[in-house]
């Protein structure tokens, strides 16, 4: 995935000296924010700066279309707007058919499709768009900045406002770099330690830093000179209904059809013909996904590359009945018998000091985490 960051000054007109001073400060802050992304695995940075704003996107070319992204996208004229997004869409064609002004958008990158859709039909786009995305939409003439993300929060963005200036960033470091001392959000830490399960937070908008917030799943936040307006644009229970009158076979067909579409829609051709991978265990969750993904790829002459964590030999040699790390090789090999295009890779990770691993991975996650058991091998797989 990519990353977005920026600074927007929403203050009204001032004296020429004040405007120059604020513009100079904004540029200094923009340079610090950009520096926070110097170690990120980005293919390129696309950015634009004027006196009252700085918008940037660090693009990763993870799909074939991503190579053509040209952030920030911009419409000129009376309704001038600019747009940056960290986005991978699952229903590109549907958005183009419904809201696109040009059919040739089907071959264009995800960011451009989402921008064109949102410009012409903002509310409908929020209701229809599927995928993983976090976006910033700026209307300079109105001095309005809109942040929004996908309905289930696959992606998010942090934000902070001070003196009518809004800072947003995919990485926390993009905001925390702007000052040396931040107050702790003691409520966040209190809840982190008192929740007696693997949930790290109970309030999705809060962060360990006082004043820095993040988009909740399915949220749109609008910043104007007058204030901040937040709302949830998606409710999973709104409009639900009971499907009656179907046979057992009919219900089964409905479920499998929806599941198949969900799996197939997220499979995208990578840049340079890169292949598709999956984190695969011996359980039903990941195997259900593999059961649809493998045949879909096989029909196109492609393989499905799986990654599975397995214990070291000393872990496997423990006495039966005692605590041990499960070795799921046999389960994966059984699945491989059914899907000839499955290419498994087994990752042996040292689980001896998970606390040390957690400290190392906290630099990646940027916030404390509880569920440390799976993080080392997942991190190695993603690398």
What does each model-identified segment do?
Residues 365-371:
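Long, Lys/Arg- and hydrophobic-enriched amphipathic alpha-helices
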Residues 328, 354, 374, 378:
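Conserved donor sugar-nucleotide recognition element shared by glycan-biosynthetic enzymes
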Residues 84-85, 371-376, 380:
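A conserved catalytic-core signature of glycosyltransferases
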Residues 1-350, 359-364:
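Cysteine-centered catalytic environments shared across enzyme families
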Residues 151, 354-359, 379-383:
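Active-site adenylate/phosphate-handling loop in enzymes that bind or generate adenylated species
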